[in-house]
From Swiss-Prot:
This protein's encoding gene: msrQ
Function: Part of the MsrPQ system that repairs oxidized periplasmic proteins containing methionine sulfoxide residues (Met-O), using respiratory chain electrons. Thus protects these proteins from oxidative-stress damage caused by reactive species of oxygen and chlorine generated by the host defense mechanisms. MsrPQ is essential for the maintenance of envelope integrity under bleach stress, rescuing a wide series of structurally unrelated periplasmic proteins from methionine oxidation.
Protein name as it appears in the record: Protein-methionine-sulfoxide reductase heme-binding subunit MsrQ
Keywords: Cell inner membrane, Cell membrane, Electron transport, Flavoprotein, FMN, Heme, Iron, Membrane, Metal-binding, Transmembrane, Transmembrane helix, Transport
Note accompanying the cofactor annotation: Binds 1 FMN per subunit. Binds 1 heme b (iron(II)-protoporphyrin IX) group per subunit.
Upper taxonomic lineage: Bacteria, Pseudomonadati, Pseudomonadota, Alphaproteobacteria, Hyphomicrobiales
GO biological process: protein repair
Originating species: Brucella anthropi (strain ATCC 49188 / DSM 6882 / CCUG 24695 / JCM 21032 / LMG 3331 / NBRC 15819 / NCTC 12168 / Alc 37)
Family recorded in the similarity comment: Belongs to the MsrQ family.
Location of the protein in the cell: Cell inner membrane
Amino acid sequence: MAAAAQTGKKKTVRPGEWKIWLLYAVGFVPAVWTFYLGASGNLGADPVKTFEHTLGLWALRFLILTLMVTPIRDLTGMAFLRYRRALGLLAFYYALMHFATYMVLDQGLNISAIVTDIVRRPFITIGMISLVLLVPLALTSNNWSIRKLGRRWNSLHKLVYVAIAGGAIHFIMSVKSWPAEPVIYAGIVSALLLWRLVRPHARNRKPVSRPRGEAMAVKK
């Protein structure tokens, strides 16, 4: 009887769930590899800044990939909705590591200096706001929160648009000149946000069924 009860309580594994865990594993490779390069003295003259920059860049990249899921589905019919939650959470983890690197390795946990930077340096202020906005999205990226919040969950997760815009602005303002890289990322982010604005008016297709439980992105 006990064995039967335990069997009945086993969690059902969804088909293809291993692909999501593989995405998480692959997603952390850049962080691990860059850390290894820094630890082995192969990140140039300023390894801390390079490590910090790389983590922030990957946070922005994963946010971009998160928002690309819907346009890809609209334009090609290819549905990657099951991976959207993982992509969004990877973006949050990288943003958190980016800030942790700044706090610990860059500022040496000097709270006074950190607070001063956040208050007085606009690009850090914007970056901090973007990180704070990602926190409730990460905390509610689960099926329980979707059921509990209902329609409010959709409204909450629209904050991802503000967060990614802030991330792009943070990137541009963090460089002293205007190299192509941050401008390109800002252009991609702008295109994705524009798509979200015009999509309700331009869409003229058969509705596509949407699986429940995909977080860190917004349903329209």
